[in-house]
Amino acid sequence: MQIYNSLSRRKELFTPAVPGKVNMYVCGITAYDLCHIGHARSAVVFDVLVRYLRHTGLDVTFARNFTDVDDKIIKRANEEGLTSQQVAEKYIDTFYEDMDRLNVLRADIEPKATGHILEMIALCEKLIAKGKAYATPSGDVYFRVRSFPEYGKLSGRDIDDMRSGARVAPGEEKEDPLDFALWKSAKPGEPSWTSPWGEGRPGWHIECSAMSEKHMPLPLDIHGGGQDLIFPHHENEIAQTEAALDKPFVRYWMHNGFVQVDAEKMSKSLGNFKTIRDILEGYLPEVLRFFLLTKHYRSPIDFTFDSMDEAEKSLKRIYEALSLARTERGRSKWSATPLPADVTAEFDTLDRAFDEALEDDLNTAAALGHVFGTIRLVNRLLEDKNLRKSAETLALLERLDGLVAKWMKVLGVFGREPEAFLSDLKECRIRRKGIDTTKVDALLEERKSVRAAKDFARADAIRDELAALGIEVRDTPSGAVWDVL
């Protein structure tokens, strides 16, 4: 598999340090608020990576942490009249609920920062002993950025350029404006722990270094997160870990792209902040997951309701095809009509292309393209009145079951019973569009009556009236059925 390594800024052949085993760490949430669509993207991207690596036979140990002590958590605790621990527990619970709805697998290891205070203190002590960090009279501990010559190697930033715009804030006791906090002295009303430098709490960056070192052998095979974490968080992780341990921290760095909303940066100040729960009020969770896979993970993705509608339509087409394929397989008689020679070859090619897309830096967008190619091929066979009855078509439909199982295993979508998904989708669209089903049923009943009376003009007028409400009517041998456009 080729992976784009943010450190080398190029694709590299992925080879685990220990053949057959992968140690992977992804930065998790700071537990102070509901998860937004940016969190969803990172979670889904690395969930698919774990799924695919396991699909290829690798033994993956996946860790994703929780930051449960932080300035933002303390602020939220004061706002809500809770302790910091209560706030963190509350939002860790909502994180799990959201991830379960998005079919994101649980990590194998889910460390919390507050459970690793001793490891963080020990790491600080190592850095101080090596002259890479220093304690201040007030009990803060800072990392000496200039003591690490490779600082900036991940983000590509020049240390002198960073120095030109840096300032020491009033009250800080930094030797250099570039230095960052490893340990913060206690402030009134904040959670704190006993340390050699007095009561205090860890800085954000030291948390991931301590947790990853405790639970996994270093260097990590893969460390992931959003592009917003490259600097300063991941840059600082590298500096403090490699300075303390004198060995590489991570072999492959992976970062997913930003999520925009209507082509603008998502922010509360712009009023375009979208939590996962906001979105799932109007869409099925599988639609959101599918949408997040329609772009390459390193590319930015623009969330709009139009793009969600398109993702919903695409997913619906796939499930409709799977439903039709299942119905056709119930046929009792099959013919000996041969399929065109290229059909089976095309089916095989599309299957291989799906895997090849994911081998190429986890290109889910291209992989979904091959899923659609497979669905179009199946539809083409089922729309042909002769080929749909062929025993060779039955063989391909049986193979389709295996492909769908693989798509579900790797991408985490297409795993529901088609009829159940389509029924839930219809109900979801009815709620989202505020459709009055009583009115729809009454119009359909009237249409049935006027058709029986051969008043086709009125029947057509009712169809148009329903279409204006966003309702599509199809006449079948067993009667009219309707769906939401």
Swiss-Prot record:
Ligand binding (ATP): K268
Catalytic activity annotation: tRNA(Cys) + L-cysteine + ATP = L-cysteinyl-tRNA(Cys) + AMP + diphosphate
A biological process from GO: cysteinyl-tRNA aminoacylation
Main location: cytoplasm
Molecular function (Gene Ontology), one example: cysteine-tRNA ligase activity
Keyword set includes ATP-binding: yes
Motif ('HIGH' region): 29-39
Domain of life: Bacteria
GO CC terms in record: cytosol
Keyword Nucleotide-binding: yes
Quaternary structure annotation from Swiss-Prot or TrEMBL: Monomer.
Protein name as annotated: Cysteine--tRNA ligase
Species of the source: Nitratidesulfovibrio vulgaris (strain DP4)
